[in-house]
UniProtKB/Swiss-Prot annotation:
Keywords: Nucleus, Repeat, WD repeat. This is WD repeat-containing protein jip5. Its main location: nucleus. WD repeats lie at residues 72-111, 117-158, 221-262, 318-355. Belongs to the WD repeat WDR55 family. Residues 41-64, 352-417 are annotated as: Disordered. It is found in: Nucleus, Nucleolus. GO terms for cellular component: nucleolus. InterPro entries: WD40/YVTN_repeat-like_dom_sf, WD40_repeat_dom_sf, WDR55_POC1. The gene is jip5. Residues 384-393 have a biased composition (Basic and acidic residues). Gene3D superfamilies: YVTN repeat-like/Quinoprotein amine dehydrogenase (2.130.10.10). It comes from Aspergillus oryzae (strain ATCC 42149 / RIB 40) (Yellow koji mold). Coiled coil: none annotated.
Amino acid sequence: MFDTVCTLPLSADLFAQAIHPKEPIVSVGLASGHVETFRLPSDEVDSDDDQASTSSSRNGRGHIDTMWRTRRHKGSCRCLTFGIDGESLYSAGTDGLVKAAKAETGVVENKIAIPPEKDGSVDAPTVIHALSPQTLLLATDSSALHLYDLRLPFSRVSARPQQSHHPHDDYISSITPLPASDTSTSGFSKQWVSTGGTTLAVTDLRRGVMVRSEDQEEELISSVYVGGLATTGTSRGEKVIVGGSSGVLTLWEKGAWDDQDERIYVQRSGGEGESLETLAMVPDELGRGKMVAVGLGSGGVKFVRIGPNKVVSEVTHDETEGVVGLGFDVEGRMVSGGGQVVKVWHEAVGSGANGASAGEKHMLGDSDEDSDDDDNDDSDDSDGERRRADEAKRKRKKGKGKDRSGGQHVMAFYDLD
C-alpha cells in the first residue's frame, strides 16, 4: 500500500507531533523548545501546470516546505495539538506554559499558565487535546487533568482551568475522545478515555470522572477509538484500543470500562514485550477494513487488523529510536516521527502482486533551515536549558536521537489482495 518514504531531518529530538485535520501540514515539538511546521506536497491536481509536481509528489520527490519555525518554549516542547478547525496550534512545554498560535504563521494569540505543583515547581505537561472549539484538555506529570475554556481571552485570572480532575494515580499518558451521542446538539465530544499508570478512566465534561478500570498490572501508554465493527451479542461495534508496556494491545468495549475485552500480542522480544508508544487508525480506504498502526518503542511500526486481531505487516521507522508520533494526513499518507527524523510514507501508485512496488527514499535536507522568529519572552539556548530539556523527557526514555538515513523502506500488506 505504501512504498516510498521521504525523510525529514530535525535539529533536536522529537517530543511531539501533530497532523493538521484539513490540510497536508505536520507540526513537530522538539527537545530544544522549538516548534516547526511543514507543508507536505499535495497530490491534488488543480491545473495542468500542477501535473508535473503532482507526479513527483506521488513518487516521493515532492518538496516539503518549512512554513515557520520558532523557539516556542524555554525548555522542551512536550506536546502539540491542532484545534478542531485546524486554525490554531496549541503547544505545551516544560516552562509551564501553553501557547496558542496561528497554524499558518506561528504567531502566538493566547497563553495559558499550567498550575504548578504544591511546592511551586513546574508540573510538566504530558498530553494536550482540543476537545471542541471551546474546550482544551491538558494532562500533567502529577496526574492532573485540567479543562480550559478557549473562549476566554488571556489574563492572569482567565488562565486558570475551569475544572481539574485526577482520574489516575500516575501521570496521564493518552487521551482519546469518544464520539458525540446521537442526541448531541453541538456534534462535539463531551466524554473521553484516558490512560495513566495501570488504569483506564472515562471522564465527562459535566460530571467529571465517571469510572476507572481495575488495575491492569501493566503500564497503559496509548489509546485510539475504533467504530463500525460488527455488532454481535452485547457488542455495540465500538471499542477503545489501548497499547501497553508489554507489547500487548487490549480492546475495551464501549460502556464496559471495568476491564479489557480482548488481547492482541503485537511485539515480544526475548520473553519481554516492547512498549506500544502510539496508535493511529489506518484510513478505511487504505486498510481495507479496520486496521490500527502501532508505533513501537523499538522503532518499528506494526499494522494490526481488527477482527482477526493479528499483525499483518510492519515497517521500520528507525532501528534504535522509538516512534513518538504516528498518524495519517488528509491525503492518506502515514507520518511517523521519532529520534531526530520524521518520515512520510506515500501510498503506492502501482502495487505489485504482494501489494508493494519499488520505491526511493529522499532526504529533504533543505527543509530544516533556521528562520527563528521567537516570541518576545523567549530566550536563546543555553546549556542549562538543554540539561533541563533532557531531564524533562518522558519516563520511558529512549536514548539520544540520531540523524539517520538508512536504506529503502517498503510497506507491503501481504494478505490484503
